[in-house]
UniProtKB/Swiss-Prot annotation:
GO CC terms of this entry: Golgi apparatus; membrane raft; phagocytic vesicle membrane; plasma membrane; receptor complex
Organism listed in the record: Macaca mulatta
Disulfide bonds: 30-36, 353-382, 432-454
SMART domains: LRR_BAC (SM00364), LRR_TYP (SM00369), LRRCT (SM00082), TIR (SM00255)
GO molecular function, one term: NAD+ nucleosidase activity, cyclic ADP-ribose generating
Domain LRRCT residues, every copy: 525-579
Subcellular location: Membrane; Cytoplasmic vesicle, Phagosome membrane; Membrane raft
GO BP: cellular response to diacyl bacterial lipopeptide; cellular response to triacyl bacterial lipopeptide; inflammatory response; innate immune response; toll-like receptor signaling pathway
Protein name (database record): Toll-like receptor 2
Length: 784
């Protein structure tokens, strides 16, 4: 019994392991380049089903808690390993020993409370290392990164437990492109801990409090090019002269992101910035200013000159006391050297005229996503305002009149670039005034329905994309680039109006086709982007686009964005891949050929009808159809005549004087039906013939040369034959009045020829002695 239980347990373990391996394999997807994605797959361990060909392995957002020495041993070619957001709390010492080619390692947001330098010693090729969000207090007992000579991007720290930075922490690192330190709860900083890094292109420092900021700042001035301070409360910051050290600063850009500041602390920050001799760019993103704009300091000192700062960027600045804010007049003297200013999404509605006049060096001004209107813009662009301004961006404000904007900006003599996109204009006046040097105008997403002469003729670049335009017919002789995508144009613009055009982007309109002639008319065109239109894939269009090899160099979005909209059977297919049949591509020739063939067929039928009396046959067919529509033959009691006599008018003498006399004067007499005597006047002759034949017991045909030349005799013969065929009786009697050669009977008398071949006929004898026998035989034939 114990042996049986042991076997059951072993089998259970094996089955469980096999299921786990199968689950791991199902959670992974690998491509032919060796990139395997297994994120969010509920994996409990690193899969062992992969081969050494794997180069990139993404196992983020799983449930891996432990990495053993053998888990990654086979992945000798691995270059990127992403293990972020698992539950990893333990990594064995030699877990990464086989990863000598690894360049990217992400262990962020796990539960690693202790870091070991032995993990990283084998990683001689490592360039990226992310250790953010793990609950360690320090960066280990020994230097973690001293062996990582190729490391360029390093991210360390956490929001809660990382409290201490030591001098050994960054030993061995000489150059980093990016260093991010989350020191939100930092309590201890050993001087010169960051000074060991000789050069850092971009340092991101998270600090909730500013207590240790100056100590860290001293170590950074000579090694960091771009310093970014995040999530810091500077409301009580105070600059201390004793904290300054290096005067030869390398910092060129200082960014404050999600920082809280007051009027007084900003004054102190200005003091700090004045110590950075090479500072050129200052940026404030998502910051909060708890003040009213009085930056003179509590001791009434003068505002500190920020030095050589040329670029100032402010994005999404929150000012709780916005409606009590001052006019910034205290900062006016500091703005004369600034060349680039961006104030985006910060509720700016006015730049005071006096401030605009102080911005003498300003070349670039971006006031996007603010509250500017024409009236306040006129005050901002007053006389002598922004004398050096070349680029003005007023995207997504509250502007509504193109005419007023152009007139207002006439004071800006050097303005060349204007972006007023994402405002709402709707209407464009026929004429406008603009600065003489205007080269670039952006009117995209302004809801305009048409373009007029309001557009300045001096433009070299025009962007009117994402509007409601269905026609573009402006003459812009200097225009080099036209962006007109996402409109309702149905054809390319007239090339003669744009003789200098180099770039045309006209995607996502309603264009159905364009031709080689149209493209060739743009003599200077180098780039065309016309994808996303509703192309009609005609044979001409396909031939042009598929056979012109040079076209691919001009169409920058070819072939992916060029799809057929019609014909329906190729809708959604790439223009490059569509092939139409010969009948679709040569329809005109095909229709012409069919028409010619039809004409020849009709001509042939006409010749045949004439040759074989086709018209006569059709008449007979019509008569026969009319006869077939009539009721069936009347019963025997309706038979009125013994015989209907069919004869030619030229044989009337023989019929009326001989035949009628012999038969009707015989005892008992025969009753004959003759057309001259018995046809009902006013009745259609065809109906008379049909009725007479149907009311007669027999039909006597008096055959002669005259008979076969008579059309009506032919009708009578055919109807008699139809009767014979339909009623299966022997109603026809042939009387040969004169010898007739069968070959002499016309082909159209096929019935007569057939009857003469199948029936015995009576021949009228010229010998009088034999004529009595003829009449006896005829009477007998009629009675039969």
């Amino acid at each position: 019994m114990p042996h049986t239980l042991w076997m059951v347990w072993v089998l259970g373990v094996i089955i469980s392991l096999s299921k786990e391996e199968s689950s791991n394999q199902a959670s992974l997807s690998c491509d032919h380049n060796g990139i395997c994605k297994g994120s969010s797959g509920s994996l409990n361990s690193i899969p062992s089903v992969l081969t050494e060909a794997v180069k990139c392995l993404d196992l983020s957002n799983n449930r891996i808690t432990y990495i053993s020495n053998s888990d990654l041993q086979r992945y000798v070619n691995l270059q990127a390993l992403v293990l972020t957001s698992n539950g990893i709390n333990t990594i064995e010492e030699d877990s990464f020993s086989s990863l000598g080619r690894l360049e990217h390692l992400d262990l962020s947001y796990n539960y690693l409370s202790n870091l070991s330098s032995s993990w990283f010693k084998p990683l001689s090729s490592l360039k990226f290392l992310n250790l953010l969000g793990n609950p360690y207090k320090t960066l280990g007992e020994t230097s973690l990164f001293s062996h990582l000579t190729k490391l360029r991007i390093l991210r360390v720290g956490n929001m809660d437990t990382f409290t201490k930075i030591q001098r050994k922490d960054f030993a061995g690192l000489t150059f980093l492109e990016e260093l991010e330190i989350d020191a939100s709860d930092l309590q201890s900083y050993e001087p010169k801990s960051l000074k060991s890094i000789q050069n850092v292109s971009h340092l991101i420092l998270h600090m909730k409090q500013h207590i240790l900021l100056l100590e860290i700042f001293v170590d950074l001035t000579s090694s960091v090019e771009c310093l970014e301070l995040r999530d810091t409360d500077l409301n009580t910051f105070h600059f201390s002269e004793l904290s300054t050290g290096e005067t030869n600063s390398l910092i060129k850009k200082f960014t404050f992101r999600n920082v809280k500041i007051t009027d007084e602390s900003l004054f102190q920050v200005m003091k700090l910035l004045s110590q950075i001799s090479g500072l050129l760019e200052l940026e404030f993103d998502d910051c909060t200013l708890n003040g009213v704009g009085d930056f003179r300091g509590s001791d009434n000192d003068r505002v500190i000159d920020p030095g050589k700062v040329e670029t100032l960027t402010i994005r999404r600045l929150h000012i709780p006391q916005f409606y009590s804010f001052n006019d910034l007049s205290t900062l006016y003297p500091l703005t004369e050297r600034v060349k680039r200013i961006t104030v985006e999404n910060s509720k700016v509605f006015l730049v005071p005229c006096l401030l605009s006049r102080h911005l003498k060096s300003l070349e670039y001004l971006d006031l996007s996503e603010n509250l500017m209107v024409e009236e306040y813009l006129k005050n901002s662009a007053c006389e002598d305002a922004w004398p050096s301004l070349q680029t003005l961006i007023l995207r997504q404000n509250h502007l509504a009149s193109l005419g007023k904007i152009g007139e207002t900006l006439l004071t800006l003599k050097n303005l060349t670039n204007l972006d007023i996109s994402k405002n709402t204009f709707h209407y464009m006046p026929e004429t406008c005034q603009w600065p003489e040097k205007m080269k670039y105008l952006n009117l995209s997403s302004t809801r305009i329905h048409s373009v007029t002469g309001c557009i300045p003729k001096t433009l070299e670049i025009l962007d009117i994309s994402n509007n409601n335009l269905n026609l573009f017919s402006l003459n812009l002789p200097q225009l080099k680039e036209l962006y007109i995508s996402r409109n309702k144009l149905m054809t390319l613009p007239d090339a003669s109006l744009l003789p200098m055009l180099l770039v045309l982007k006209i995607s996502r309109n309603t264009i159905t086709t364009f031709s080689k002639e149209q493209l060739d008319s743009f003599h200077t065109l180098k780039t065309l982007e016309a994808g996303g239109n509703n192309f009609i894939c005609s044979c001409e269009f396909l031939s042009f686009t598929q056979e012109q090899q040079a076209l691919a160099k001009v169409l920058v979005d070819w072939p992916a964005n060029y799809l057929c909209d019609s014909p329906s059977h190729v809708r959604g297919q790439r223009v490059q891949d569509v092939r139409l049949s010969v009948s679709e591509c040569h329809r005109a020739a095909l229709v012409s050929g069919m028409c010619c063939a039809l004409f020849l067929l009709i001509l042939l039928m006409g010749v045949l009808c004439h040759r074989f009396h086709g018209l006569w046959y059709m008449k007979m067919m019509w008569a026969w159809l009319q006869a077939k529509r009539k009721p069936r033959k009347a019963p025997n009691r309706d038979i009125c005549y013994d015989a209907f006599v069919s004869y030619s008018e030229r044989d009337a003498y023989w019929v009326e004087n001989l035949m009628v006399q012999e038969l009707e004067n015989f005892n008992p007499p025969f009753k004959l039906c003759l057309h001259k005597r018995d046809f009902i006047p006013g009745k259609w002759i065809i109906d008379n013939i049909i009725d007479s034949i149907e009311k007669s017991h027999k039909t006597v045909f008096v055959l002669s040369e005259n008979f076969v030349k008579s059309e009506w005799c032919k009708y009578e013969l055919d109807f008699s034959h139809f009767r014979l065929f339909d009623e299966n009786n022997d109603a026809a009697i042939l009387v040969l009045l004169e010898p007739i050669e069968k070959k002499a009977i016309p082909q159209r008398f096929c019935k007569l020829r057939k009857i003469m071949n199948t029936k015995t006929y009576l021949e009228w004898p010229m010998d009088e002695a034999r004529q009595e026998g003829f009449w006896v035989n005829l009477r007998a034939a009629i009675k039969s």
